[in-house]
Each structure stands twice: as C-alpha cells, then as structure tokens.
C-alpha cells in the first residue's frame, strides 16, 4: 500500500506501508489554521480531530 505522508499543504510525498491495509488523513484547527497529517494505518484520534481512513493507494491526499 502506498500512502501520502506530507503535512498540511506541503508538496505531495508518499511512503510505502508494508503490512498496512489503511492510509489515513486527520485534520484539526488551531491558532495556525487547519493542520493536516497523513500517513499509514488508521489511528485513534482525540475528540475534535477529524479522521478519514481509506484502503487504496494514495487515497489520503
């Protein structure tokens, strides 16, 4: 599985995720604006953090 792993609005970069079945994108807002984090897996998130998990290559941009 290949997942995007760039932060927020950085240029897209990807990572090969051995043994993973999900990519994730999570986002939240703070004083800097909207922060977006991407990577492999499907993490648990705190209340107030939005999470989207998906199962295809580069699906989490």
From Swiss-Prot:
Q: What is this protein's function? A: Binds to muscle nicotinic acetylcholine receptor (nAChR) and inhibit acetylcholine from binding to the receptor, thereby impairing neuromuscular transmission.
Tell me which InterPro entries the record gives: Snake_3FTx (IPR003571), Snake_toxin-like_sf (IPR045860), Snake_toxin_con_site (IPR018354), Toxin_cobra-type (IPR054131)
Q: Which one of the record's GO molecular function terms can you name?
A: toxin activity
Keyword Disulfide bond attributed: yes
Tissue-specificity statement: Expressed by the venom gland.
Sorted alphabetically, the keyword list is: Acetylcholine receptor inhibiting toxin, Disulfide bond, Ion channel impairing toxin, Neurotoxin, Postsynaptic neurotoxin, Secreted, Toxin
User: What SUPFAM superfamilies does this protein's entry cite?
Assistant: Snake toxin-like
Further information in the entry reads: Negative results: does not inhibit GABA(A) channel composed of alpha-1-beta-3-gamma-2 (GABRA1-GABRB3-GABRG2) subunits.
Where is this protein found? Secreted
Q: Which CDD domains match?
A: TFP_snake_toxin
Query: What name does UniProt use for this protein?
Result: Short neurotoxin 1
Q: Which PROSITE patterns match?
A: SNAKE_TOXIN
Name the GO cellular-component terms.
extracellular region
Q: Does the keyword Disulfide bond apply?
A: yes
Give each disulfide bond as a residue pair: 3-23, 17-40, 42-53, 54-59
Q: Which family does it belong to?
A: Belongs to the three-finger toxin family. Short-chain subfamily. Type I alpha-neurotoxin sub-subfamily.
